[in-house]
Structure formats: C-alpha cells, structure tokens
Regions:
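Glycine- and acidic-residue-biased ligand/ion/polar-headgroup-sensing regions
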Residues: 1-20, 108-124, 130
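Histidine-centered metal-chelating micro-motifs
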Residues: 3, 18, 30-41, 103-104, ...
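Short, structured motif recognition centered on aromatic/hydrophobic residues
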Residues: 10-17, 25, 29-32, 49, ...
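Glycine-centered loop/turn motifs
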Residues: 22, 26-28, 101, 126, ...
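A short, N-terminal "cap"/entry segment at the start of jelly-roll beta-barrel domains
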Residues: 46-90, 94, 169-172
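Surface-exposed interaction/gating patches
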Residues: 73-123
Length: 172
C-alpha cells in the first residue's frame, strides 16, 4: 500500500502500471494522486513510470486520470499540439508534441521543468536526448530546437517561484 501524503504525479512511459489490482494504465496515462490518498501499485510484466513526489498541497483533493494517447485530450494552440494535464493558480502542466526543426520557446517568470518523453532537443551545442530533465529557474528563457521526429515533452510551469516562496517562509 502506497500513501501519497504530499501527493504524487505519475506518467506511464512503458508497460502497464496497475493500481489496486484492478485498474490497468498502459503507456501514456497520466495519474495525479492527491494528498493522503492510498493505493496499491503493481505491474504484472513491469512498467517504467515517471514519478514526481510532493506535488500537491493538502487542499488539492481531486484524483486525475488522463489517457494522453486519446486524440480527444489534445488541442491545437496556435502551431502547438498540447495535451493539458493540470492547471491551477500556481501550476500549469501539459504535454507538447513537436516536429523536427520546430523551436520550443517558453518565457516563464516562474520557472519551467521539461522532461523529454521521446525525441531530442538541442540548445546551442548541448543535446538533450529522451529521458533528459531540464529545470530552468524563474525569469529564464527556454529556447530549444527539436532534432527528431515524434518529440514529446512533459512541461510544468508557473510553480518554481511559488515553491521557492513557500520554502523561504518555512525556513524563516
């Protein structure tokens, strides 16, 4: 039994992730478990999951399940293919699909985190392959060129400045 005291976020990258012996989530599912939720996790044949711990306040109570493989969950924002995952006053999390030579640009006053689910990004001479994690602090400009077909990113913004403020309050 897993207890998600501070809340967790999971993205199934491969295999099948099972919850409570009855709910199977294949690759592409996004799961958001609120503060103090309980569930039993397993996988019959194994699963690779991207997990972020301590992602929610005790005030967030909604469990979220999104199949990111379902086209109905994707929208076009300008020239961007976006799968919104979660949005609040202090967080915006989404997946973004990009084409080769496309530029991923994000100007975030509050910081940004990027996980490369598939494909590859490049910034100058630096190459970021699948599985790379990029965190830019508040007031930094994200500007990356897409190098490969089928590049998909997990992107989280609007949260780092708020997290830093909470950290400072707790440590004062």
């Amino acid at each position: 039994m897993v207890s998600d005291k501070p809340g967790t976020v999971q993205l199934v990258l491969s295999g099948i992730f099972t919850e409570n012996d009855t709910n199977d989530f294949p690759a592409g599912w996004y799961l958001r478990n609120p503060h103090n939720s309980h569930h039993q996790v397993s996988s019959k044949d194994g699963a690779l999951i991207f997990v972020k711990l301590m992602q929610m306040s005790e005030h967030e109570t909604q469990t979220t399940r999104i199949n990111t493989n379902d086209p109905i969950n994707w929208i076009l924002k300008g020239h961007k293919a976006i799968c919104p995952l979660y949005e609040s006053e202090f967080e915006y999390t989404y997946l973004e699909r990009l084409n080769p030579n496309q530029i991923f640009t994000n100007i975030s006053d509050q910081g940004i985190e990027i996980f490369i689910i598939s494909g590859q990004l490049q910034q100058g001479l630096e190459i970021y392959p699948t599985g790379s994690w990029i965190r830019l602090p508040p007031k930094r400009h994200a500007d990356f060129q897409v190098c490969e077909r089928n590049t998909t990113l997990y992107v989280k913004t609007k949260h780092l400045l708020h997290a830093q403020q909470i950290w400072n309050i707790k440590n004062d």
